[in-house]
Swiss-Prot record:
PANTHER family recorded: SERUM RESPONSE FACTOR HOMOLOG
The keyword Nucleus is assigned to this record: yes
Localization per Swiss-Prot or TrEMBL: Nucleus
Signal peptide boundaries: none
UniProt-listed PROSITE patterns: K_BOX, MADS_BOX_1, MADS_BOX_2
Domain MADS-box, first and last residues per copy: 3-58
Record organism: Petunia hybrida
Single Gene Ontology MF annotation: DNA-binding transcription factor activity
Protein name: Floral homeotic protein PMADS 2
């Protein structure tokens, strides 16, 4: 008696379903590895369980992006939507602009100009001339600013020197007055010592004669 056809349907028991998923998943990945080795095939496999956890396998000789690109080219089906397509086009446009800027920069340096025609060389020369004029104008502006700052610093230096000189003169004037006062005091002391004793006492005791 032959075996009856087994109906394939969802396993209701969650535990049994998880066990069956793990076994079948491991079996599929094992078969993918075997066909890669035995047949030199390129295999890419992605599995998502009902929990959202991902398992994947890709042949060592390729990558998942390469497999997807190959699928898109072979099948003629577009895997990316318009948004991704626009983003890819924008990236390509920016790359081209960057390449063009690099070429122009080399031309400005005088490199790789043998391929330029007369008109292109004229445009390049005009651009360099305008650039030199702008640089010269900027240099002149910076030079004027430097000279102006030098004048300001020189004026401030003169003012500081004048203030310092005035302060030194005031200090010297005070010292001279102190020196003159010391000399005058010494002269008075000397004259006082040269006077007779009686005369020295008389100014200090004006009523002495009256008592005598």
């Amino acid at each position: 008696m032959g075996r009856g056809k087994i109906e394939i349907k969802r396993i209701e028991n969650s535990s049994n379903r998880q066990v069956t998923y793990s076994k079948r998943r491991n079996g599929i990945i094992k078969k993918a590895k075997e066909i890669t080795v035995l047949c030199d095939a390129k295999v890419s496999l992605i599995i998502f369980g009902n929990s959202g956890k991902m398992h994947e396998y890709c042949s060592p000789s390729t990558t998942l992006p390469d497999m997807l690109d190959g699928y898109q080219k072979t099948s003629g089906r577009r895997l990316w939507d318009a948004k991704h397509e626009n983003l890819s086009n924008e990236i390509d446009r920016i790359k081209k602009e960057n390449d063009n800027m690099q070429v122009k920069l080399r031309h400005l340096k005088g490199e790789d100009i043998n391929s330029l025609n007369h008109k292109e060389l004229m445009v390049l020369e005009e651009g360099l001339t305008n650039g030199l004029s702008s640089i010269s104008a900027k240099q002149s502006e910076i030079l004027r600013m430097v000279r102006k700052n030098d004048q300001i610093l020189e004026e401030e230096h003169k003012q500081l020197q004048y203030a310092l000189h005035q302060k030194e003169m005031a200090a010297m004037g005070g010292n001279m007055r102190m020196i003159e006062e010391v000399y005058h005091q010494r002269d008075r002391d000397y004259e006082y010592q040269q006077m007779p004793f009686a005369l020295r006492v008389q100014p200090m005791q004006p009523n002495l004669h009256e008592r005598m």
